[in-house]
Amino acid sequence: QLMLNQGTYGGERYLSLETSRLFTQSKSPTCRRGLGFDKPVIGNPKASPCGALAPASVYGHTGFTGTCFWIDPDNQLIYIFLSNRVNPSRANNKLGSLDIRTRIQDAIYKAIDRKSQKDS
């Protein structure tokens, strides 16, 4: 929530706006990462660590055990996926091969889109 609020939480500022932006915006056309967070691969959704329907402003992290979180400031959304990919062994790659995390994220965006179309 702190990052979604650009460094504030509960009415208190913990990170400056400048620091929050450094963490979440890529600084180079050759690297999609901010200082600490991953970003989507623009123009190549198959190579992207997040869903194809996620906006360019999204940032997050994928973990070794299959966990991930993505923060979407455009939609005021935080997507958190908890898992234990290494069970029963480190060779388990079903999360990646089945594209589970990004498919769930895209399902969230499809549901948001359906809701906004219904409300229009």
Predicted segments, located by residue:
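Catalytic loop of the DD-peptidase/beta-lactamase superfamily, centered on the K-T-G motif
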Residues: Q1-S120
